[in-house]
Amino acid sequence: MSLAARRKVRIRLYGTNPADVEQVAREIVDLAKKMGVQVKGPIPLPTRRLVVTVRRAPSGQGYHTFDHWELRISKRLIDIEASERVLRRLMTIRVPDTVKIELQLI
């Protein structure tokens, strides 16, 4: 295999369910190791925490009570040395709806 045909791929996984993100990351790493390519990761990135504070009483009258809603976004980063064969196998992995994937050629 020539050097031009071999590239690095950076895979970013993110989602609201940390268990699903971890499972997909584990499947990608297992697949890459099984195919014999070099893998770095999964690297856990900081969890993003989105908080929304809303007033309970819509009219503005009465006690000042508030609800707090929170959404946590877990992220993982995986770098693999991938050929076309490996990328085709990556497309066959089942990904839950709660996990989003970004691929970037480096």
From Swiss-Prot:
One GO CC annotation: small ribosomal subunit
Keyword presence, ATP-binding: no
Signal peptide: none
Pfam families the UniProt entry points to: Ribosomal_S10
GO biological process terms on file: translation
GO molecular function: structural constituent of ribosome; tRNA binding
Record keywords, A-Z: Ribonucleoprotein, Ribosomal protein
Domain of life: Archaea
Complex and partners: Part of the 30S ribosomal subunit.
Function: Involved in the binding of tRNA to the ribosomes.
Family, per entry: Belongs to the universal ribosomal protein uS10 family.
Name recorded for this polypeptide: Small ribosomal subunit protein uS10
Gene name, Swiss-Prot/TrEMBL: rps10
